[in-house]
């Protein structure tokens, strides 16, 4: 794994109020640019890690202004040094496409195959992961942003060892966080991710600042789209916005609520063709999930489909999709699934 060698700092300059220690020769404009452009890599350190933060600041400065690296190259290198879990974002251009259902069941599939998994509800102002998971959290992201608790204190336990961080619902100000708040939240997520093998991000729908901010963390981005034409168009809009924002994660299409494979194929082909033609982007086909009464029944009963109907076609296809990200996660045996279903009955 790539290791960054911080620029030597001797003697260590006095800390500024914001925790950085720019060298006397640094231009103020450069300091401000680094603080704004790389905020997610400079936040989340406690007081005992101040020197680490200083070293990182100087390393960024030297790569940027001495070695001529681009901001994208620096961000990629910094991400490579983070010993953290793999970030998989589940997003959509339009609401009502089953995004949260996919995120919850995908995260649970990872947890069921033994991966340390965290599910983060990133639909900050209109969160509902906790509803589908059957949880009533005492602490949410709202408490974190109001500085009442640390992000790690907002983690709650779900089924199969799955851990979740729940959002708040109906809190308008969470849907309009400023850049500093979003960068601080991202920084805390990166620190917390060192304790997990995979972090699933259930983003909000659309292309708002909150959505794109979370997508900057993602190694892979699952774009959920349905056969509905508006959903397909909005899914392309999300991919295009990610391209224009220079999101580095790999995009993939998951066709949801399809009546059969042929209908799902149309969705995937439309999106992959448009991305290749107009954006010169290669977008993966992640598979498809059927429209099924059991899915809605599971949501209404506040349980995941993998718990309530583990042998269903939806559950089997979901595990296959999970195995595409983490090999071995599709091997949750049919016998184990049958036992769960029998117990539920």
Question: What are these model-derived regions, one by one?
Answer:
Residues 1-18, 23-46, 50-94:
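Extreme N-terminal, non-catalytic leader segments
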Residues 80-123:
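Walker A/P-loop phosphate-binding motif and the immediately C-terminal alpha-helix
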Residues 92, 119-194, 269, 293-304:
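P-loop/Walker-type NTP enzyme "switch/lid" segment
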Residues 211-229:
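Inter-motif core of Ras-like GTPase G domains
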Residues 226, 253-265, 288-295:
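G-domain G4 guanine-recognition motif of GTPases
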Residues 236-246:
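Conserved C-terminal guanine-recognition region of P-loop GTPase G domains, centered on the G4
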Residues 277-306, 318:
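Beta-strand-loop-alpha "switch" segments that mediate conformational coupling across diverse proteins
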Residues 300-345:
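NTP-binding/hydrolysis catalytic cores, primarily Walker-type P-loop NTPases
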